[in-house]
Curated annotation (Swiss-Prot):
Residues where [4Fe-4S] cluster 1 binds: C73, C77
Influence of pH: Optimum pH is 8-9.
Coiled coil: none
Cofactor(s) needed by this chain: [4Fe-4S] cluster; [Ni-4Fe-4S] cluster
Domain of life from the UniProt record: Archaea
UniProt binding sites for [4Fe-4S] cluster 4: C427, C455, C458, C461
EC number: 1.2.7.4
Residues reported in the UniProt entry to bind CO: H117
Name of this chain's protein: Acetyl-CoA decarbonylase/synthase complex subunit alpha 1
Amino acid sequence: MSKLTTGSFSIEDLESVQITINNIVGAAKEAAEEKTKELGHMGPTPFPGLETYRDDWNLKLLDRYEPVVTPMCDQCCYCTYGPCDLSNNKRGACGIDMLGHNGREFFLRVITGTACHAAHGRHLLDHLIEVFGEELPLNLGQSDVLTPNITITTGQRPQTLGEIKPAMEHVEEQLTQLLATVHAGQESAEIDYDSKALFSGSLDHVGMEISDIVQIAALDFPKADPEAPLIEMGMGTIDKDKPFLCVIGHNVGGVTYMMDYMEEHELTDKVELGGLCCTAIDLTRYKEADRRPPYTKVVGSMSKELKIIRSGMPDVIVVDEQCVRGDIVPEAQKLKIPVIASNAKIMYGLPNRTDAGVEETIEELKSGAIPGAVILDYEKLGEISVRLAQEMHPIREAAGVREIPSDEQLKEWVDKCADCGACYLACPIELDIPEAMKFAKQGDFSYLEDLHDACIGCRRCEQVCKKEIPILSVIEKASQKIIAEEKGWMRAGRGQVSDAEIRAEGLNLVMGTTPGIIAIIGCPNYSDCAKAVYYIAEEFLKRNYIVVGTGCGSMDMGMYKDEDGKTLYERFPGGFQSGGLVNIGSCVSNAHITGAAQKVAGIFGGRTMEGNLAEIADYVLNRVGACGLAWGAFSQKASSIGTGCNIYGIPAVLGAHSSKYRRALIAKNYDESKWKVYDARNGEEMPIPPAPEFLLTTAETWQEAIPMMAKACLRPSDNSLGRSIKLTHWMELHDKYIGGLPEDWWKFIRTEADLPLAKRADLMKKLEAERGWEIDWKKKKIISGPKIKFDVSAQPTNLKRLCKGA
């Protein structure tokens, strides 16, 4: 019997019977694999499995960047043998040790994040194929390299929605294999869990890429547009006199139907539609490819979810998936705000009204008979949510629940405070709430106002208050003036970096004359304040780094203004260029950040992209200066995103809370045996400077993070001008934020031309006096001293197989 593929067939000799098969499980992937074999220029690893990258690449990375384990506790409670004490090198009843257990815990978080993005991608892909068909072309802007992550992983270059299916199937298949290794009695070696985590991270970027490219193509999002529209942002942008429909989550599928309903019924100026988290970003991208005037609003990041509910402003809340608080229904109930769950991943125990009538459902929700409902039919969702917001607005105003608490209630709550300090101890960022309460009792609410921006809205303080004071409501009430003026601007997510931008900037990045790419991504679980990401972005933008952002990071960068009242998005261009601030989009748009680095390797470096992860990653690690920042990372998705960057040789700095992820990847910069690569010209070993010296680490303060990130953009292949520019920035930033010169600056000097021009003479004196280097002062040249010699034609690689004659 011939092999079945997708399509339809009929069986002869059966009268009036036709059997139609729309899709055979695995057939799309099998067809893609057959097609892959026919293509030229294919790398060695299309459609990889758990073991594929292990020896060729992952273990090479992990040999240099050794895992640093930070357990949360000494016990393992994973199976019924336990709990087992794993302290002091003891093994559990199953035989696993602390390293293996900790590796499993980190790995579990990575695959959870990968699964989240993959499921997001599967949902959007199936939905958009159902609506638009498999033949819808992937119009993503003026680029030939449309799907770098998919291409590197599968060897395929899909051109339509339907052609993405093999990549989606591959991610799902490998996730099943990865999840199986977590079971008791499976993998026990920490190093192999780390290798599997890196593999999962690469799949995560495939899942994210699928999620974003299908919505860009089908929903008319901006397509690699550096001039995407500016969007109003902040709690102060919401008009309280209008019904407010508030959306929260990451999957914009259902929200587009709300927008369609509003546009069809001419309600865009009569109803406020705004959101939090990545759904907010993506609703501002819908139909914006032609840069029409936007009417939707971005309220802010996840940290504002509870704050916006406590404000009483939303008339209806619609949630979809990812990074949505678990207490939204009970919190909304207090203020008569109906909650609609629009995605099966979050249903909150609410009654399912997907098949119920529109009028019946609106009446149930409006009357308060039910606190909310599950509505998975997007056509109904669009109509019900908008109409319900219009009807709830006057009802809630009449009930007096538009804003809480009253001035009298605020004073009563403040006076109840016993100054016990429990809230201070419970606060994850140690906000001095007792001191603010003390001043508030005296009528000075400025200290409470100061807490508004720093507060991450977790409500842990309220859980421990013996007086049952709703502390978050106290802070928000005291900050009403600030909230009313909380208005920023953010450029709508532009999508991919175009091939043309890569060609224009690739040489500068590889040579080092553009100092590097700084990617500000991740969640708002900041250890200091949200303004830290603004300070970091501004510092690097003024120094002509390319700053790219996604998700909550992109939002928080745009919430603050300079002395002229301008946000960063108004001050700096939106192109992928030196000194450009590029809002790529939502969380799933992170794939385009790794995609940009991959494109540099493929387009500028001439590397084969198809099925060729190790070569692409090797090029990025040695040549492309880039560093990620997830300053408020909290979720499993943040872990998988960062790990996906790591496998491609892109380091990431995380905030102080992120040690709770349990693992960092830090090299020993003093161990010279770790800092050797091959010269691809002849296969000989060549020493390189310790750059980058980590793949994943944490910083305590944003002041510490800035010079750390500048240093992480140094690369072995920098030419002398690029090295001089990068060292100038690193050394200046170290002096500005830490004080003095870095201890190891001299390790990066190969020739006098590497030295920062303005301080060249002084630094040469230090090299002579402190390091014993020989200097020819007449010629102002370094005669001897550097262990690394500059060779402009050297071809550094970690892969022996790439060397000539290998």
